Amino acid sequence: MIEKTYCQDIKPELDGKRVKLAGWVYSNMRVGKKIFLWIRDSTGIIQTVIAKNVVGEDVFETAKKLGRESSVIVEGIVKADERAPGGAEVHVEKLKVIQAVSEFPIPENPEQASPELLLDYRHLHIRSPKVSAIMRVKETLIMAAREWLLREGWHEVFPPILVTGAVEGGATLFKLKYFDKVAYLSQSAQLYLEAAIFGLEKVWSLTPSFRAEKSRTRRHLTEFWHLELEAAWMDLWDIMKVEEELVSYMVQRTLELRKKEIEMFRDDLTTLKNTEPPFPRISYDEAIEILQSKGVKIEWGDDMGADEERVLTQEFDRPFFVYGYPKHIKAFYMKEDPNDPRKVLAADMLAPEGYGEIIGGSEREDNYDKLVQRIKEEGMDPKDYEWYLDLRKYGSVPHSGFGLGVERLVAWVLKLDHIRWATLFPRTPARIYP
């Protein structure tokens, strides 16, 4: 391993010290007999100065031709200079070129490129400081979730990705051949988490989920990261409390640790700071009334899509819940409302500022006969869910759970214009490369 000093550690206090930097050329500018070479590594960008009378003619000419993303190692002396970014720069004495790049396919300002070009060259685009910032924020949100879940006594489990049945509807399954059988890519770990609660009571997982939806909206991916929780002995109101406490902690902790990165995308942090529980709660009935009062053409019983949710979120300055959805627009495993058989005990958490649903949750149907009936109503075969139905035959208990779309949360926190920027290599109906 090359011993090096990271860019973030080059500070005025190191004035006069010799350092070695290893990284990539971010920008190259010649001014007379000096070259200002900005070098990027995983921690930031530092200005280096290459003077012809120090490094000699040959090295100077080599440096002059270095294009963006050329990989280099430089050695030199730190000089405190208030004009330099960060108050210090490195005056180069030695330059080693690992690989020279003449022309990088992505413009210096990626925002000048089309989304399609950035996605075609996503393997190169992810080097940019903004993409790195997105990934750091995503990483920190997940780290914060782990902290909270560990503190609150939840157990992480590791469910399968290859499954035999649908959780969210058969039309969105990715089908594949599994030796002499048929298998599918998991839409959700939920059914397996439900099995785990009978031993561990409070469980969670973080896995990729797959949906063969041809939706081309700004909030849909065919592959996304799914943070899912399931707990025995909890009803809908209990699990909603878990959701708001978890999301609040994730956002506040990430604000604490990644404020600089978040400010690259948001000028105003007020909305993110305003995530202390409890979150507002409105019924589906109230949501329909609000939308109708805003001129939206929607009737009771209709599902709310991205457009309707966007209008609804304008009424709130923080995440909020919509609960009590009609049974026919929700999944088979959700428990029927005992006070209104038209509805299920389900709630979605919506993010403000037009982002909409980030969590879907419900109390689960714990009665064997009712669950069989719901499976049949959805046109599915109970035999395909025999193992899942066993959970209702051997010590069934009230339980609830939810799933959080990680990329949707990242998109809201960073105010991204499309969910595809919240994942390393996005998968959509139109894109599986690179």
From Swiss-Prot:
* UniProt entry tagged with the keyword Thylakoid: no
Which enzyme type, at the first EC level?
ligase
Q: Does the keyword Ligase apply?
A: yes
Cite a single GO MF annotation: ATP binding
Can you cite an annotated GO cellular component?
Answer: cytoplasm
Q: Its Gene Ontology biological processes?
A: asparaginyl-tRNA aminoacylation
Superkingdom, according to UniProt? Archaea
The record lists the catalysed reaction(s) as: tRNA(Asn) + L-asparagine + ATP = L-asparaginyl-tRNA(Asn) + AMP + diphosphate + H(+)
Principal subcellular localization:
cytoplasm
- Location within or outside the cell: Cytoplasm
Return the EC number: 6.1.1.22
Q: Which UniProt keywords apply?
A: Aminoacyl-tRNA synthetase, ATP-binding, Cytoplasm, Ligase, Nucleotide-binding, Protein biosynthesis
> Its family?
Belongs to the class-II aminoacyl-tRNA synthetase family.
Q: What is this protein called?
A: Asparagine--tRNA ligase
Q: What is the source species?
A: Pyrococcus abyssi (strain GE5 / Orsay)
